[in-house]
């Protein structure tokens, strides 16, 4: 059963081959047997899941129509609210915070009969690229337990990779879905800004954040987006970008022109570069032509991103003060102590580093030097993409400059920030992007191909990713030994 996609599991429930309850039991058995060595989940909600599964099974018994996600087990990144469950953001600051409402994506999942299994680990407040910045425990890469799974949605990627669930929700502020997807050999999709409601997502960078799915195959991304996408009265940034379904769009022809910023591929390892150009050959064999495009301005994207993201983070995290909710220091003896000690003790070092950076670039003395210049260059990055799309329909890039690296191998914060070089620009420019498995490094670790589209052209991005998946032969890949995680096959 672990090899089945979300769509296949849904169809098995509709046909009566499996029940939603049996599927939930099967995946909980996998989690309880093996997650102690991977650390993907922070908490489980078995009672809620079994209650929902029983409702789905009863609907089927009565002959009622079932939702698009009927019986599909889904993991949720722990910065997305689910009523009655803890939303910790993997931080001591919110260790005991219980969500008082459902995020819009959660409402849409449950309206379509999806089964929520639990909350997934992440870098604290989604700030990090390794999932080692969780306040509770690190997450390991199922392909090599000595390696990081990426971040900040590392728990989501690891859970899907280990087949603890066929689908998980993550959030992507600068690559936090796509990079861990590539590291863990799964599919990760960052929708266009405004395509999916952010209501109920704990904000990191409000002009950058986007909720998206991680899955084993591209078909499940399309399934998820047919549920998640659409305007929401609780999120004024949402738009109705799409008319037809994502699943129908997968069958369309690949675009004739695919842009590649050749000047932005410097510094890639030989095996990464070889894999990338081999991936382009797969697309060329389907009739696409590769054209060189000028995106040299993206060499400034990481700097701009960390100015903008840190400024927005400092503003968004100002609410966590030890007064209204969250951790409050027991050592405080004055109001100033409450503010200071609660934040120093409640936040981890990386979160405090970014708050300090954000307040620095927003300070009266530095705002014009850093923040205003950063936002001006962001506008130029958007213009550069618009000009590039005059020559092509979609853009192809690697997801990362390296495969998953060993835990502790990269400790310098600047070196970690530079891991985002191929992902942050899409958030700055509001663009959709998908990461699909493209092969393996010389160490045998997964690599990913990234396809980027114009804002609102999410369906085309998924279609190219699907076409690559089907013609490359790299589909639904599993870590060695994944089939040994749980021997039973529940019907």
UniProtKB/Swiss-Prot annotation:
One of its GO terms (biological process) is translation. Transmembrane segments: none annotated. GO terms for cellular component: glutamyl-tRNA(Gln) amidotransferase complex. The keyword Protein biosynthesis applies. It catalyses: L-glutamyl-tRNA(Gln) + L-glutamine + ATP + H2O = L-glutaminyl-tRNA(Gln) + L-glutamate + ADP + phosphate + H(+). GO terms for molecular function: ATP binding; glutaminyl-tRNA synthase (glutamine-hydrolyzing) activity. Allows the formation of correctly charged Gln-tRNA(Gln) through the transamidation of misacylated Glu-tRNA(Gln) in organisms which lack glutaminyl-tRNA synthetase. The reaction takes place in the presence of glutamine and ATP through an activated gamma-phospho-Glu-tRNA(Gln). Heterotrimer of A, B and C subunits. Belongs to the amidase family. GatA subfamily. This is Glutamyl-tRNA(Gln) amidotransferase subunit A. It comes from Chlamydia felis (strain Fe/C-56) (Chlamydophila felis).
């Amino acid at each position: 059963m672990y090899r089945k996609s979300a769509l296949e599991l849904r169809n098995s429930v509709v046909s009566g081959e499996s029940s939603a309850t049996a599927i939930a039991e099967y995946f909980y058995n996998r989690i309880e047997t093996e997650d102690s060595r991977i650390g993907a989940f922070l908490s489980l909600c078995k009672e809620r899941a079994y209650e929902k599964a029983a409702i789905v099974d009863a609907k089927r018994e009565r002959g009622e129509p079932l939702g698009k996600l009927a019986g599909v087990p889904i993991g949720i990144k722990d910065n997305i609210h689910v009523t009655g469950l803890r939303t910790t953001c993997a931080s001591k600051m919110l260790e005991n915070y219980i969500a008082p409402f459902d995020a819009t994506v959660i409402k849409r999942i449950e309206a379509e009969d999806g089964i929520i299994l639990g909350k997934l680990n992440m870098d604290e407040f989604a700030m990090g690229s390794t999932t080692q910045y969780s306040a509770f425990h690190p997450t390991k890469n199922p392909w090599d337990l000595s390696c990081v799974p990426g971040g900040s949605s590392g728990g989501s990627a690891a859970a899907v990779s280990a087949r603890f669930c066929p689908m998980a929700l993550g959030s992507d502020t600068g690559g936090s879905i796509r990079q861990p997807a590539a590291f863990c050999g799964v599919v990760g999709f960052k929708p266009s800004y405004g395509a999916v409601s952010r209501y109920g997502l704990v904000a990191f960078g409000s002009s950058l954040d986007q909720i998206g799915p991680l899955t084993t195959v591209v078909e499940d991304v399309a399934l998820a987006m047919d549920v998640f996408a659409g305007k929401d009265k609780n999120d004024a940034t949402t738009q109705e970008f799409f008319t037809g379904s994502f699943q129908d769009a997968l069958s369309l022809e690949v675009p004739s022109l695919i842009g590649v910023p050749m000047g932005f591929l410097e510094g890639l390892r030989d095996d990464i570069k070889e894999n990338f150009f081999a991936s382009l050959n797969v697309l060329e064999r389907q009739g696409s032509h590769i054209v060189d495009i000028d995106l040299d301005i993206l060499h400034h994207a990481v700097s701009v991103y960390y100015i903008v993201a840190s400024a927005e983070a400092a503003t968004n995290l100002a609410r966590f003060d030890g007064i209204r909710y969250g951790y409050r220091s027991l050592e405080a003896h004055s109001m100033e102590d409450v503010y200071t000690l609660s934040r120093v003790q409640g936040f981890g070092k990386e979160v405090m580093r970014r708050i300090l950076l954000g307040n620095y670039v927003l300070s009266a003395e530095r705002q014009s030097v850093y923040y205003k210049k950063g936002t001006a260059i962001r506008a130029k990055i958007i213009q550069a993409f618009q000009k590039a799309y005059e020559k092509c329909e979609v853009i192809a890039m690697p997801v990362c400059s390296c495969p998953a690296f060993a835990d502790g191998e990269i400790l310098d914060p600047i070196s970690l920030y530079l891991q985002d070089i191929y992902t942050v620009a899409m958030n700055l420019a509001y663009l959709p992007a998908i990461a699909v498995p493209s092969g393996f490094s010389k160490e045998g670790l997964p690599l990913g191909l990234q396809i980027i589209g114009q804002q609102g052209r999410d369906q085309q991005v998924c279609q190219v990713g699907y076409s690559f998946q089907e013609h490359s032969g790299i589909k639904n890949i599993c870590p060695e030994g994944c089939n040994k995680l749980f021997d039973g096959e529940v019907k």
